[in-house]
């Protein structure tokens, strides 16, 4: 398995399995001198960790991160930052009934075919448990981006099943267990999730993530366009089946006169492009959305087969999220932060002395 790293100048490599001893990651390329403690990462880890509400998995993991290297006297040294989180609440016996079965919609079958064996305990490496280390690494990137460049990143659940946010109130996002920005829909969300859990089924979701104060110029055309790398990072999150930048698939019905973001010395008139033009950041907010499938780990019986190829019925036991999109919000923030951090360092390496006479545009007020 060789796809465990992301980034060129800010490189994040993760390791570990859902029911293994621990999860870990190595961060290479973080500039020296950044003040960093475990507390800087713990906030986002607590937002992602399981067992924090009745809407998510009952697995309870403290997800307490430890810094192993790369930090001395509270500051990054410029060397590799090693991080680790121990697994403490594994219940591998919950998966003994699927040891020789494939769960429909999961990575069981493809891992078995690719590697000739698989860790059936909670999905092993394919489990979303792995994303805890992405969130930890993303928190490092988020701190640097804000401290050095004033870049802020925030995400929210913009749709759960048929319930869509109609109003975006940023202050509301952290005030409820759904990370939902529209307070008028919270009661409907609660009722929907109650009925969903009773049925033993699951549901998909849409998560939006936004970065503000991003400077002009990030992105490396043609193959490492900023939007391409953002899409790559978000698509690499478990259960994500679609990514949009800006207006995304809505551009299919837009006309050119409607979609183009008109410019004047006063700024851009709109942001249909999502803050990226020609693969390079425009200075407007970076806006991305991702669609997450409903988890296949449900208690409703389904047809499948055994490792030997015999027909079988599967009923998934264990502790699972009825909607994986809820805990995906801090993961999306982390992946966007990692991409922006990487591109900032790449841009600095080649273009830090470039000067343009053209004024930098913002959004019109």
From Swiss-Prot:
GO MF: chorismate synthase activity; FMN binding
InterPro entries linked: Chorismate_synth, Chorismate_synth_AroC_sf, Chorismate_synthase_CS
Note describing how the cofactor binds: Reduced FMN (FMNH(2)).
Pathways involved: Metabolic intermediate biosynthesis; chorismate biosynthesis; chorismate from D-erythrose 4-phosphate and phosphoenolpyruvate: step 7/7
Any single GO BP term: amino acid biosynthetic process
Positions with a binding annotation for FMN: 125-127, 238-239, 278, 293-297, 319
One cellular component term from this protein's GO annotations in UniProt: cytosol
The keyword Cell inner membrane belongs to this UniProt entry's keyword annotation: no
Binding site for NADP(+): 48, 54
EC number(s) on file: 4.2.3.5
Keywords (A to Z) from UniProt: Amino-acid biosynthesis, Aromatic amino acid biosynthesis, FAD, Flavoprotein, FMN, Lyase, NADP
Substrates-to-products reaction catalysed: 5-O-(1-carboxyvinyl)-3-phosphoshikimate = chorismate + phosphate
Annotated region described as Disordered, given as residue ranges: 41-60
UniProt keyword Lipid metabolism, yes or no: no
Functional description taken from the UniProt entry: This reaction introduces a second double bond into the aromatic ring system.
Record text on subunit structure and interactions: Homotetramer.
Protein name (Swiss-Prot/TrEMBL): Chorismate synthase
Native source species: Shewanella amazonensis (strain ATCC BAA-1098 / SB2B)
